[in-house]
């Protein structure tokens, strides 16, 4: 059970990181 929670947490952090990087690139392109 703990492994599932850890996996979901890792997946969520990776997804959030990807979104942050994507938004950063969009802001750079807009400027």
Curated annotation (Swiss-Prot):
Major site of localization recorded for this protein: plastid
The terms under GO molecular function for this entry are: electron transporter, transferring electrons within cytochrome b6/f complex of photosystem II activity
User: Which Gene Ontology biological process is one annotated for this entry?
Assistant: photosynthesis
User: Which InterPro entries does the record associate with it?
Assistant: Cyt_b6/f_cplx_su6
Q: Write out the GO cellular component annotations.
A: chloroplast thylakoid membrane; cytochrome b6f complex
Does this UniProt record's set of keywords contain Cell membrane?
A: no
The domain of life is: Eukaryota
Q: Does the keyword Protease apply?
A: no
Q: Which UniProt keywords apply?
A: Chloroplast, Electron transport, Membrane, Photosynthesis, Plastid, Thylakoid, Transmembrane, Transmembrane helix, Transport
Location of this chain's protein in the cell: Plastid, Chloroplast thylakoid membrane
Bilayer disposition of the protein: Single-pass membrane protein
Q: Which residues cross the membrane?
A: 4-24
Q: Which HAMAP family match?
A: Cytb6_f_PetL (MF_00433)
Q: Which family does it belong to?
A: Belongs to the PetL family.
Q: How does it assemble?
A: The 4 large subunits of the cytochrome b6-f complex are cytochrome b6, subunit IV (17 kDa polypeptide, PetD), cytochrome f and the Rieske protein, while the 4 small subunits are PetG, PetL, PetM and PetN. The complex functions as a dimer.
Q: State what this protein does.
A: Component of the cytochrome b6-f complex, which mediates electron transfer between photosystem II (PSII) and photosystem I (PSI), cyclic electron flow around PSI, and state transitions. PetL is important for photoautotrophic growth as well as for electron transfer efficiency and stability of the cytochrome b6-f complex.
Give the protein's recorded name. Cytochrome b6-f complex subunit 6
What is the species of this protein?
A: Oltmannsiellopsis viridis (Marine flagellate)
Q: Which gene encodes it?
A: petL
